[in-house]
Amino acid sequence: MSGVSDNINGFLNEITEIDQKITNAKTNIVKIQEFQGQILNSTSTTQENFTTKEREALVSDTRNLLVECKDRIKRIQYDNVRIHSSDPNFGIRQQRYDVLRTKLSNVLEEYRQAESDFMKQTKVRMARQYKVVNPNATQQEIDDYLSNSDSQPIFQQALLRTNEAKSALAEVQKRHEDIKNIESTIAELAALFQELHLQVESQDQTVINIEQNAEATAQKT
């Protein structure tokens, strides 16, 4: 009995640690959004570059936190699979797992939405600078540049024009790199979300199979 008690106490401690890390990730996301607002509203290149570096560092830390939480929830899931539903701790283990999985899913979705909004705003800002370089540019030309930045000869011509155009060109190219980085983060978040939910589906079927096999064995004896 004491072994079961020790086991559930260790499990509850693990749950508390993971829950706190998810909360930390959520706090980071709020700060990342603050950085993004500062970047979009910045009028100083020096300050913007500094804030961008701070944001990138926090994005990296948050990525590591989210991956760690996903991995630790996965381990709990696999442990739960090995416990029969008649175990006295099965209910609380499954309930706590479900709560953590839902909390992490919500944080992943919240973060994905924040990055998606930031990408849209960055594209709007980039489009304004693009039109400084090429005042007659259409939205299609801007979209084409986003898809393939190497295919725009207009920028080679822009280098021969005003200092304003040169500055705008540098701005456009920087925004394009920012957008690619944001897209990468969004893809990572989508992959984490999908993996988390694929694991749940797999686990649910595994539990069903285990219980069906146990019942079949009992009926034969």
Where in this protein do the model-derived segments appear?
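Juxtamembrane amphipathic/hinge helix adjacent to a transmembrane helix
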Residues: 204-221
